[in-house]
Amino acid sequence: MKKTLLIFIPFLSLLGQSISTDQLDQLTFRNIGPSVAGGRIHDIEVLPNDPATVFIASASGGIWKSSNKGTTWKPVFDDQAVSTFGDMAISLSNPDVIYAGSGEQQNRQSTSWGNGIYKSENQGETWRSIGLEKTYHIARVIIHPENPNIVFVAALGNLWNSSKERGVYQTTNGGKNWKKVLYIDDMTGVVDMAMDKNNPNILYAATYQRMRKAWGFNGGGPGSGIYKTTDGGKTWNELTGGLPPGDKGRIGLAASKTRSNIIYATIEHADSSGFYRSGNGGRTWKRVNKLNPRPMYYSHIFVDPNNDDIVYMLATEFYRTKDAGKTFYQMPTRPTYDVGVHSDHHTLWINPNNSNHFFLAGDAGLHESWDGGVAYNRLNNIPIGQFYGIGADMEVPYNIYGGMQDNHSWMGPSATRHWLGILADDWKQVGFGDGMYQQPDPESSMLYNASQNGNIIRVDRKTGNMQGLKPFPSDSKEKYRFDWVTPLAISKHSSKKVFLGGNRLFISDNGGDSWERTEDLSSNTNRDSLTIMGVLGADIKLSKNDGTSSYGEIISISESPLWHRVIWVGTDDGNIQVSRDGGEKWEEVSGNITGIPAGSYVSRVLSSIRDRGSAYVTFDRHREGDWKPYVYRTEDYGKTWVPLTRGLPSGSVNVIAEHPDNPDVLFLGTEHAVYLSVNAGSDWTKFKSNLPTTLYDDLLIHPREKDLVLGTHGRSFWVLDDTSPLAEWSTVYNKPVHVFSVRAATLFHYWKDTSYRAQEEWAGENPPYGAIISYLVNSDVDSVTITVKRRKNQIIRTYRQPVVKGSIQRLAWDLKYPPPSSQQNESKTEGLQKPKPEDIL
């Protein structure tokens, strides 16, 4: 017998202990984009038997598939443990079989790590892990052309620590077992690999010795070189004829598709860096060109499948040679790199049946050309934006702001009246370069916009006028240091007060027109005295500290919401500094924390609403090869600290946020997921719902709407509407039935104000228009009846909803009376759970 529970909701009066993953599953997030600017892509693959089916493997946004030549895309890897990829390969003999190597190979300061290799046997629809979990970064995957069970994997290995899980691995049984067939040492992996077109027993491998730390990068060593096997990987010989002696850095490889003995390489070297060619299978080499831009991040070369004198080199710019490397010319971008083809290229797929047709991808997503690079179609319909920092204003509806990796800074609405959703046209560029933190002034049209390495501008959102605000030392002998992701904050007590973090904290009381500086708040360590791979920082020769222009600077700033004189900062060299007098004097309190090595990178500090002395701090030690989560709380200005990691799996923590209505409710953004605590961090629950696996670099709770806004580094923005039920959870979780507070709602009407748009345009999801009614049922019933009434008990609307016992459920009422019965079948009632016509009483 079915049981129904009646819930009566008087509308006008509603204006106004642990929790499980399952209890959160009915709270779904909206992916709002943008897709107008893409994210980094490392590989493009096309089904050989169906050229309409295209795959892209991204740096941190997972794997995506199109079945219609890029008109529309779908993510096919969201439910897996990682979202970062270096390479994919499709079997020529059985195109249903695809292998994907996780962990990007580009070595930058924001690189994430993978957990081995994955396999699909149904054209990428589903995937399973098949081993090599501790290789962390896989640069190349090659499948035997006649046997999909024979696979070679180039494992670059741990970027931040020594490990033996690197080299060339081979399987002969489809990934059931793996054998390491080429190994140099515990700091040298394999960054590229090529197979002879006519003889699959001949392979070339480029080994690469490199390591990154929080303070710098060493991009070369004696382990780097080129190796060759002629017996399918059983034995390997180093190729040295004509190659520069001594330490080498990153090497890129490409083999001719038409003639077996022609091999190309880009080689990073202190004196003889450049483009090399061998015409005898690698026995001897000749440098034919000095071109080799920023090899640590690029070193990508591709040979035309129909003419081996035509080679493409991908770097900040896009180059092509038609004479085997003697001359390279830069491919045109029309009319500019933003409107046409964006810079920073990482992969190329050339149609084997038509060399004029290719896909080009890199930091800004995917481009397609049908005329050999004269003109391009920019496929900006994949929402894989990589945000570093985010912000939100107080407009209605509010706007969200974010700074993207290599794709500027953007603002866009949290909701629109477009019947299609939140469109690319709704997003506006508000800054340049690599966008970082964005702070809109809540009392004016000004936006404070940070980009890489301390660049800050003030933008008038009404006029577009921009003014540079970066502080410079008056003493020419001093040089300020700023992190790549420079922290920026506006005071919670005065919108004219702005904070900017460098090695000192810079404080402005006039909107950035002038700055006061504190003492140096870092440890001020000379990184030239530190070592990477046994080499002093001062003596690094190849790609020295690439991506880390300085060390010893503030990473996070937090002013107390309760008292403007209390300020916290955390630095990349492990300092946690607190001031109780507005920045005049500082106390370094990281030494009071136990259970973590000194000097650990501080990813976030957060001053609590609980009381003036309360704060949280998170550390990120993956740059030391330590994947553990580190979260701490203090209630006495840092004198004592309590660890808060129960329930957190392996993976670094990037950000922590506190609910403005309940300090016991905390959110964490980590390298792979979002976590929630409803008991002040005593334990944590994964907030999965419909969220993808990706990097969660920043998050905020909107102070008015209480929406949770997620800034991901791989999947753009996600929004959870109205988190008020989470703030109320601890006091109502065991009630038989409860209706959570309903926030004030605005009546929106869809406006069909745009038509005749291409189907390839991606649109973000609008919120459910109307009042979001959240409720909890712990009783043993099958359904609930929800009735909305006026004060005088006049029934406005009634819904019947199925019950998911113990979970927070939602219904969106569109603020309307029910339509006439003749129109109910045509109704487009909006809601997180859209009622069926037969369920409306």
Residue ranges and their predicted role:
Residues 17-761, 768-771:
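Beta-propeller blade termini and top-face loops
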Residues 456-459, 773-774, 780-798:
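Beta-strand-rich binding/interaction modules
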Residues 597-598, 795-840:
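Glycine-centered tight-turn motifs at strand-turn-strand junctions
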Residues 253, 771-779, 813:
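Aromatic/hydrophobic beta-strand junction motif of beta-rich domains
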Residues 491, 720, 776-778, 814-816:
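Solvent-exposed residues in well-ordered beta-strands and their adjoining turns
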Residues 680, 790-794, 841:
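Short, glycine-anchored, charge-dense loop/turn motifs used at functional sites
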Residues 245, 570, 765-769, 780, ...:
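Solvent-exposed loop and beta-edge segments used for protein-protein assembly and interaction
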